[in-house]
C-alpha cells in the first residue's frame, strides 16, 4: 500500500491496553485501537494516557490505526 493511501488524524490517548496498544479518541469523536509505529518504539518514545498524538489509518479499516507522532 502506498503512503498516500493513509489518513492522518489528531487524537488523545484515552487508555493503555496490553501489548503496547492504546485506545485513542480522535478529535471528531471516533474511537479506535492504535499501536505505536516502529520508529517510536526504536527511539523509546513514551506514550501515556492523556497525550495528544497523531494517528495514521488506512481507509479500509477505520477501527485500527498507528500512532506516528506524539505532540509535545
Curated annotation (Swiss-Prot):
Main location: cytoplasm
SUPFAM superfamilies, sorted: Nucleic acid-binding proteins
InterPro entries: NA-bd_OB-fold (IPR012340), RNA-binding_domain_S1_IF1 (IPR006196), TIF_IF1 (IPR004368)
Residues in S1-like domain copies: 1-72
Gene3D superfamilies: Nucleic acid-binding proteins
GO cellular component: cytosol
UniProt-recorded Gene Ontology molecular function terms: ribosome binding; rRNA binding; translation initiation factor activity
Keywords, sorted A to Z: Cytoplasm, Initiation factor, Protein biosynthesis, RNA-binding, rRNA-binding
Membership in a protein family: Belongs to the IF-1 family.
Protein name according to UniProt: Translation initiation factor IF-1
Annotated source species: Cereibacter sphaeroides (strain ATCC 17023 / DSM 158 / JCM 6121 / CCUG 31486 / LMG 2827 / NBRC 12203 / NCIMB 8253 / ATH 2.4.1.)
Phylogenetic classification of the source organism: Bacteria, Pseudomonadati, Pseudomonadota, Alphaproteobacteria, Rhodobacterales
Amino acid at each position: 500500500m502506498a503512503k498516500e493511501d493513509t489518513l492522518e488524524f489528531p487524537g488523545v490517548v484515552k487508555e493503555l491496553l496490553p501489548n503496547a496498544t492504546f485506545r485513542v479518541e480522535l478529535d471528531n469523536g471516533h474511537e479506535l485501537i492504535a499501536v505505536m509505529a516502529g520508529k517510536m518504539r526504536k527511539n523509546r518514545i513514551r506514550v501515556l494516557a492523556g497525550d495528544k498524538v497523531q494517528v495514521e489509518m488506512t481507509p479500509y479499516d477505520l477501527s485500527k490505526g498507528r500512532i506516528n507522532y506524539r505532540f509535545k
